[in-house]
């Protein structure tokens, strides 16, 4: 390289920006959701739900693919495909006349319904979603169990037991607080009654004392009057006796 010629190596700032754009920028993959398992009775129908999350807007090239692997089988076969706004049911397998498309791509829903269930339908169903340019991600699987009569799920029984226990506890607490409220109300009424009786006794005592206070001077006055009358009568009697002696 000739002296004074500009350097052809990238600047440190440009190298750092390139490194951050390639390494540090997050890579977001499409995420597919299904139930873990579903139960159905022979002759009934069951819905296999499938939804997804994507960092991109819903594309016109959005596609859903359902595959089925029989119970104990090794290979999975395609049973349903949705692309370009049209559902396609594969002509291979026993589901070709029993599958119904019930999904809504605008709501990111790729669900299907399987009608007229049979014991041979037991197996694993896989939902795969592509939303270009977001095409990288894992599929999701749901296992179908077909019974003569759908058994009550353990979670439902446990939930019912827990709900019953909580109901009994709440009822007991309500009854306790109701009894306590009635008892406190009765005690308050009794306390008010006793307080009123005490006030009545005090008022009566004060009234009697006031009455006795008013009667005492009258009694003393009557007693003095009686004494004065008696003294005057005795004096008069004594004077009459002395007068009779003088006449004799």
Curated annotation (Swiss-Prot):
Residues 1-28 form the signal peptide. One of its GO terms (cellular component) is plasma membrane. Keywords: Cell membrane, Disulfide bond, Glycoprotein, Immunoglobulin domain, Membrane, Phosphoprotein, Signal, Transmembrane, Transmembrane helix. Residues 29-155 are extracellular. Residues 30-143 form the Ig-like V-type domain. Residues 224-248 are annotated as: Disordered. InterPro entries: Ig-like_dom, Ig-like_dom_sf, Ig-like_fold, Ig_sub, Ig_V-set, Myelin_P0-rel, Myelin_P0_CS, Myelin_P0_Ig-like. Gene3D superfamilies: Immunoglobulins. Its main location: membrane. Homodimer and homotetramer. This is Myelin protein P0.
């Amino acid at each position: 390289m000739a002296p004074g010629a500009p350097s052809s190596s990238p600047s440190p700032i440009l190298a750092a920006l390139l490194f951050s754009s390639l390494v540090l920028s997050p890579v977001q993959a499409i995420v597919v959701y299904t139930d873990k398992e579903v139960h159905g009775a022979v002759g009934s129908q069951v819905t296999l739900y499938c939804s997804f999350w994507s960092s991109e807007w819903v594309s016109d090239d959005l596609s859903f693919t359902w595959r089925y692997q029989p119970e104990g089988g090794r290979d999975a076969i395609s049973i349903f495909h949705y692309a370009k706004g049209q559902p396609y049911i594969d002509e291979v397998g026993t589901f070709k006349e029993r599958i119904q498309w019930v999904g809504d791509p605008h709501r990111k829903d790729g669900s299907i319904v399987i009608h007229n269930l049979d014991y041979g339908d037991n197996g694993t169903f896989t939902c795969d979603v592509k939303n270009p340019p977001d095409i990288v991600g894992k599929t999701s699987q749901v296992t179908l169990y077909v019974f003569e009569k759908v058994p009550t799920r353990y979670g439902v029984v446990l939930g019912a037991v827990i709900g019953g226990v909580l109901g009994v506890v709440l009822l007991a607490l309500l009854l306790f607080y109701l009894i306590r409220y009635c008892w406190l109300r009765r005690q308050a009424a009794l306390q008010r009654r006793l307080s009123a009786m005490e006030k009545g006794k005090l008022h009566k005592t004060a009234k009697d004392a006031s009455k006795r206070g008013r009667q005492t001077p009258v009694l003393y006055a009557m007693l003095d009057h009686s004494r004065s009358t008696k003294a005057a009568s005795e004096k008069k009697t004594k004077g009459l006796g002395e007068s009779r002696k003088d006449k004799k």
